[in-house]
Amino acid sequence: MTSTVPSHASQRATPAPVADGVAVRMRGASAVVGGMTVWSDMSLDVAAGEFVAVLGPNGCGKSTLLKVLLGLTPSHGMVEVLGERPGRRTKRIGYLPQRRTFDASVRIRGIDVVSLGLDGARWGTPVPWLNRLLAPRRFAERQRRLDHVIEVVGAADYARRPIGRCSGGEQQRLLIAQALIRRPELLLLDEPLESLDVPSQAGISALVRDICRRDRVAVVMVAHDVNPILPYLDRVIYIARGSAVIGTPEEVITADKLSALYGIPIEVLHDRAGRLFVVGQPDAAPAHTAGAGG
């Protein structure tokens, strides 16, 4: 099986100086699902303002890593998220689960979907006119925050349109705005580029990079295809066969590293355009451009 990864080493953005804070710290960590260990002995730090991708074949435990950080999946070893055990700082985490689409018949406006990031933990349905009447100052602050995140993701032109009438890329921008609404310090994205066209993938990738750099948000993104985000990444976590290799893309996506990880010979080839071809991955566990899973 062959997959392609363009080489963008010379184009990669220089990371902004990292603050002292560490958003994620893991030491000898392992994930357990249904009594089975999915991966083990993972050690890493993700700092504020760092953009990290999680790569690997179907079922290797990519999404499981995000669930461990959210406290939704049991783990062993040391795992700290924003200085606490997983599950203790969820209001400071923005989470976008695997892509969901909205049918064309869905009439709820995009801005109302974004506002669920504020109201989703509360009982009942938000009633804007009642909130404006009973708590005008809070309502005004809420509206300013909504307008701000919608502007940040570039969705102002269509935020008040029914979300079912928005394109896939527009819907995804609105969902990212929902994940940002509470000013998270850590953003966990589970395959946000899945099923998007190439221009939308490029736009979302650049948007996430900008949020990461400008707001010092640590980003951990599970990637179905590393190509669109490769110019922006600081590091990758490549998971296969229960183990992980962590480093810059140039350090990790090599024949030696991937061969050792998969336990079989893997080749990494270059074409005239500077693109990389990863060759020899098992058909049951393709990397980079394979389907999402685990």
Language model regions located:
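Conserved ABC ATPase "signature" region
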Residues: 127-158
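Conserved ABC ATPase signature
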Residues: 162-166
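Conserved ABC transporter NBD signature motif
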Residues: 77-91
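Catalytic Walker B motif of ABC-type/P-loop ATPase nucleotide-binding domains
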Residues: 187-191
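Conserved catalytic motifs of ABC-family nucleotide-binding domains
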Residues: 183
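ABC ATPase nucleotide-binding domains
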Residues: 255, 261-294
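Conserved structural motif at the start of ABC-family nucleotide-binding domains
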Residues: 24, 38-41
